[in-house]
Amino acid sequence: MTEERRREGELGAAARPAIGRGFRLQWEAAQQAHVLLYPEGMVKLNGSAGEILKRCDGQRTVAEIVTDLETAFGASGLTNDVMAFMAIALTKNWLEIRE
């Protein structure tokens, strides 16, 4: 099984995602956006991506992150969108699943 598929298979409601090794999430005031910094550069995140990633601390589960987002933004039914973004972030190594 490839590393990409292994990681995607680990992504479920009980998974505990964290920012991937080699990346650092921070607020960039000059750009008014969250960014992911890595040795070769920077990724400017849209608002939704920043809100999701800043909750990925390796302690909270995906289910807890979704609940927190739904509460913070008065929304419901965010699970599929959050999971889809996290799956993409895993393939880009922005996220990793912690035990």
Regions found by a protein language model. Name each.
Residues G41-E99:
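Long, charge-rich, low-complexity alpha-helical segments
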